[in-house]
Structure formats: structure tokens, C-alpha cells
């Protein structure tokens, strides 16, 4: 094993339930994230040689510093990963380790689930490697505990090899990325770097500086309930209004029909009765004009329906969540060019594609710190079929070390 503690560190992290809670109003959204930061990560950061390790209870970030040991390396580089996991069972994570994978089906514990290369052809990219999977009852949490483990392992390597020269390094582990609010309270003044990287990507080589622009849409439908036996010309069914609204959106502009640079409308929740219904959507696009046009479209649909109904029964609430960080990063591509150069020197082919999602870097970039995203290794994230390759994680550690030594 290239880095002795990487696997054990990762296994230790994923066994801690740090699932975030979208309905919480606290920061972090769950107590387990703060406990993870204070009882596991903070002591370990101090033990491996990070300095000024401190936890900010206001924003939930745990930050540490490794000062440069060569004054000619003047850049300051940050590395960021998130502590929370996605909206899937994270209690009693029991990882499986598959050594020397040879393309077979992988039975997930004693569950009835398996990782089948026919269903998941990405498995064929990992022949001969060590895979870490779930037992079929939980997610794994490689998103983003692989990133945390990689950053920690890189720091440990550097402090154990003081002859290796590196620049100033800042490390930040934050909360609630999966529910879209993790970076809302991020303190730039507490993270003085020239640029940073989130270690939150997927397969080997991913290097990303384009994200969706994102908005949350809540639509409330106000009906009028009367006895169905005498409902003619009187009843207004709020659930039917919700159906009508949804059908006015472009049918092919949904996640299941889009890829690449295509945006979408995604219905994530629908609840209600005849009297009142509520639909929750997320809106995503890459280009600013297209993003704004999508928001205008839903407003226009609501206005048209209200005009037809003769009163305001379709109420729209739109909230922007984050924006495409390309707008910031393309002004100075130093972080991207450096990462490309380091990867190529390590014989890793950079895979530069848009993220069909967002990272904490989306918001942090607009706060003044360009923060692209680098691969951390996770595959099939956010569910029971999640897995990660140990060899990909090792290569991510290589990249982190390469970046700070080349700065």
C-alpha cells in the first residue's frame, strides 16, 4: 500500500454517521458533524502536524495550517472537503474491501443487492484494484470522506518527510454541502489562500471548474374543496393544478433526458390535498441567460394559470442557490493550469468536464477564492451502490502533494 494509513483512515471516517438534515435550522445541521470534527478530525489534524487547528461553531468549519518550509514557494493553496453525507441511510456503515477485483459481481453483504458490471459498467475500469463498497444497507460516504482522508494523508506524508519542500497549505473541513448550505457562512478571512481545491470529485482525473447555476422552486397551489357529488363548476383541485403546472414544463428537460451542458427542471417532491398542494423543484443550467430564462418560464406559467383561473391560486417562490463558478475561475486559470500540469507529470489524464451539480467551491469562488474541484474517487455516490478505488484515492493524494510542491 502506497500510503499506509489511507485505507484505515477512510474506513474510520465512513463508520461515523454524519448525514446532514435539510429540515434543520442549525449549523451544522446535525450534531454528529460537529462531534466528528471535534472528537475525530481535530485531534488527528493536530497529531499529524497541522498548526492553528480551530473549529468555528458559527459556520461549522474546522481549519488548520501547514506553513511553508521553503520561502521561495510563495503561493498559498487551500484544500477543502465536506464532512456530511447525502440523503440516504448512513447509520452503521459497514464497508467491504474487495482486493484485486477481477470483474465479477460483488455481493453487498447479506443484502439482496449486488454490484453487477452489466448494470454498472464503470466497474470495468477497476480491474486489479482494491475496491471499498457498502454492505447494501447504507451509502458508503466516499462523498466526501475520501476527500477528507486524502487531504489528511497528504499532510501526514509531508510532515513525516520534512525534506520535501512545499508552500503554505490551508485545510478546511466543512458541513452541510449535500444540502446546499455548507459554504453559506464560510469565512474567507480565516482562509487566506491564493486559490483552493475541493477534493470532492469522482473518478480518476476529474478536474472541474464549471458547475450548474442552481435555483430552488417551491410552488403552492390553492384549491377549493367541495363534496365531489356536487363539485361541478365549483371544485378546484389543487393536486390537478400541480399536475397541470408540471405538464406545462418541457417534458424532455428533466434530469433523465439531459446530459453535458443541458439544463433541466426536476420535480423533487409533491404533497397535498384537494384544498392545497405543494411542489418542490430544482432548476439547473450552465449558461446565465438560459438559467434566467428557466426562472422566467415558471413565473410565466404561474401567471398564465392564474389568469385562466381568475384569481391567484398558483404561488411561486424562487431562490437562487449557487452560480456557475466558471465566471470567476476563467478570469485567472492558474489553479487549473497548475492542476493540469501536476496531473500530467503523474501520468494522470486530466478530464475537464462540467460538473452536473455543485460544490462548496461554487460559492467560495464567488467569495473571492477560486476553488475548482479535483477527483476524490467516489463512484455511484449517494446510495447503496457507492464504491471507491483505493488506488484512485492514492493518486488523489499524489496530486495534492504535487500541487503544494510545485507552487
Swiss-Prot record:
Gene3D superfamilies: 3.30.70.360, Zn peptidases. Its cofactor is Zn(2+). Zn(2+) 2 binds at residues 143, 178, 382. Zn(2+) 1 binds at residues 82, 143, 200. InterPro entries: ArgE/DapE_CS (IPR001261), Bact_exopeptidase_dim_dom (IPR036264), Peptidase_M20 (IPR002933), Peptidase_M20_dimer (IPR011650), Peptidase_M20B (IPR010161). GO terms for molecular function: metallopeptidase activity; tripeptide aminopeptidase activity; zinc ion binding. It catalyses: Release of the N-terminal residue from a tripeptide. CDD domains: M20_peptT (cd03892). Binds 2 Zn(2+) ions per subunit. Its EC number is 3.4.11.4. It holds the Pfam family Peptidase_M20. GO terms for biological process: peptide catabolic process; proteolysis. Keywords: Aminopeptidase, Cytoplasm, Hydrolase, Metal-binding, Metalloprotease, Protease, Zinc. The active site is at 84, 177 (proton acceptor). It is found in: Cytoplasm. GO terms for cellular component: cytosol. Cleaves the N-terminal amino acid of tripeptides. PANTHER family: PEPTIDASE T (PTHR42994:SF1). Belongs to the peptidase M20B family. This is Peptidase T. The lineage of its organism: Bacteria, Bacillati, Bacillota, Bacilli, Lactobacillales.
